[in-house]
Amino acid sequence: MCIKHTLLLSVLVSLVACNQNHHNASSSQWLLIDNFESNLNDWQKADTDNQTKPHQPNPQITIIEKEQSSDHANHYLLKKPAAEGVIGNRKALTYKKLPKPVPVGETYTFYTRINVAAFPNNHAFGLSNLQPDEINKHGYDAFEPTLRVTDKAESNGHINDGALMVKTDTGYSNIQNYKTAQSAQPLNTNTWYNVWYVVNNASVKMQGQQYNVYVQGGEFKTQTLVYKNAKFRMKRELPLIYFLANCNTGPLKKPYGNGGLKYDDLYMSRGINLSSPL
């Protein structure tokens, strides 16, 4: 009897340990892209459409700042197209090579935290499958999976409201609150949002070149699917190799505004991984 109890206990302990290891495996699979706790030496910056007048070389602001909390000092990246009052920087590119490429045919999950420092603004971030010289050449068309934050007016007169946006085959779309069957609310300023985007880098023929987005923050109190089957911008069907962020003051005659966007805790994980890397 005692032996049976001992064997049963051993089995139960093994099962618990197995479950714990499985639970912890998801967080251990995350690869750090950057958490901005050191420097920006591995990042490249390029202002490839600098129309500032009077001309200002390298007008973009891409800096690490410190955020004081009750228990520790956290650092994050602040990105702006230029200082307040400076207009005409149309492409403020900032990018970093991923710790490993996302091969064609594979799915990876990317995680980041974002925080709108201020509106009005015009920001986009996501992934590229181009090398640096080609990123600089193509600008916005260097993106594949893309997320966008802006409240600018479009050329057709439509005014964006500051909700997080994704790329579609016809332009951009606000993320959705599927529970209310409505567009998501505008992002709150000075509020951190957790964003997961699950990137399917299979070919178009294999129903790839698309991504799903999950958000926690603001109106979404828990992690929530907010967009299904958003589309890669160019669908080049190449390995994804860079994290890319871009922002834009707007044209000299009708500037958008230079409000900043904060980034922190960029991670990637093979497969679908909706755990938190933090």
Q: Language-model segments: what does each one mean?
A:
Residues F36, D264-G271:
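Extracellular beta-strand elements of beta-rich domains used
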Residues H75-K167:
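Secretory/extracellular carbohydrate-interaction modules
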Residues L15-A17:
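C-terminal motif of bacterial Sec signal peptides marking the signal peptidase cleavage site
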Residues L40-E84:
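Extracellular glycan-recognition surfaces and repeat-rich motifs
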Residues T191-V204, V213:
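Short tryptophan-centered beta-strand motifs in secreted/extracellular beta-sheet-rich domains
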Residues T168-N194:
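Short, aromatic/His-centered strand-loop micro-motif at the edge of beta-sheets
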